[in-house]
Amino acid sequence: MSAAVACVDYFAADVLMAISSGAVVHRGRPGPEGAGPAAGLDVRATRREATPPGTPGAPPPPATAPGPGGATAAPHLLAASILADLRGGPVVATAASTAGGTSPVSSSSAASSPSSGRAPGAAKSHRCPFHGCAKAYYKSSHLKSHLRTHTGERPFACDWPGCDKKFARSDELARHHRTHTGEKRFPCPLCTKRFTRSDHLTKHARRHPGFRPELLRRPGARSVSPSDSLPCSLAGSPTPSPVPSPAPAGL
């Protein structure tokens, strides 16, 4: 096995040296009449000891065909593709830029570029050890929270006087704590109502005739249109009392 690998490496090195010195393909004289076209071909490649290209009488280097972007392929890119074919690795493609240069782009790296923002090669390595559960997570903290659904552990206890409730997650405890304090962190952008939970706000805001989903993503936007606040008044929200008109002067 090692001898085969050494043979492949030697052949690859020989190919690289032939490319760097400028391989030349000569076409021999036409063969005798009636012979096929292959009879007159004489393919020769310059060796390591070939005459340098700058000396008189040296054959000109072969012209490379222009690629799709108009730029000629560099010898090291051709050598890289030959080595990739020999070793069975990914083929390196070239993307032509507007300035006329080329930059190597690996097809495997382009295929593995994540669209979700995670680092390449990230995987859900934290798997649930419980039998019959195939869930996996990117972070160990997420797995730890999931394990509590199996064990029934609730480490987050409410410290409000007279309340003995416990929760498996800290965000559940924080949401429950607002039921004691009366804090309503989610205001409706179309009326004066506020809510302790965001899902309650979404359910309420959809009842407005002028509701748009983007309004919930802009917390300072408010509308004073009476038609927008009509569903809130129907639901029991306080309506402003009419302002009495001033009495005529002289009475």
UniProtKB/Swiss-Prot annotation:
According to the lineage, what is the superkingdom?
Eukaryota
Q: Name one GO biological process term.
A: negative regulation of transcription by RNA polymerase II
- Locate the compositionally biased regions of type Pro residues: 53-65, 239-251
Q: Where are the zinc fingers (C2H2-type)?
A: 126-150, 156-180, 186-208
Q: Which GO terms describe its cellular component?
A: nucleus
According to the UniProt entry, its GO molecular function terms are: DNA binding; DNA-binding transcription factor activity; DNA-binding transcription repressor activity, RNA polymerase II-specific; RNA polymerase II cis-regulatory region sequence-specific DNA binding; zinc ion binding
Q: Where in the cell is it found?
A: Nucleus
Family matches, as Gene3D superfamilies? Classic Zinc Finger
| Chain positions found as Phosphothreonine | T151
The reply to whether Zinc-finger figures as a keyword in the UniProt entry is yes
**Could you say which tissues express the protein in this record?**
High expression in brain; olfactory tubercle, olfactory bulb, nucleus accumbens, striatum, hippocampal CA1 region, amygdala, dentate gyrus and frontal cortex. Moderate expression in hippocampal CA2-3 regions, piriform cortex, septum, and distinct thalamic nuclei. Low expression in the cerebellum.
Q: Which residues carry this modification: Phosphoserine?
A: S103
Main subcellular location: nucleus
Key words, A-Z: DNA-binding, Metal-binding, Nucleus, Phosphoprotein, Repeat, Transcription, Transcription regulation, Zinc, Zinc-finger
Stretches for region Disordered? 48-72, 95-125, 201-251
Q: Name one Pfam family in it.
A: zf-C2H2
Positions with biased composition (Low complexity): 95-123
Q: Fetch the PANTHER family from UniProt.
A: KRUEPPEL-LIKE FACTOR 16, KRUEPPEL-LIKE TRANSCRIPTION FACTOR
The Swiss-Prot or TrEMBL record describes its family as follows: Belongs to the Sp1 C2H2-type zinc-finger protein family.
User: What does the protein in this record do?
Assistant: Transcription factor that binds GC and GT boxes in the D1A, D2 and D3 dopamine receptor promoters and displaces Sp1 and Sp3 from these sequences. It modulates dopaminergic transmission in the brain by repressing or activating transcription from several different promoters depending on cellular context.
Print the domain comment field: The Ala/Pro-rich domain may contain discrete activation and repression subdomains and also can mediate protein-protein interactions.
Protein name per Swiss-Prot or TrEMBL: Krueppel-like factor 16
Task: Tell me what gene encodes this.
Answer: Klf16
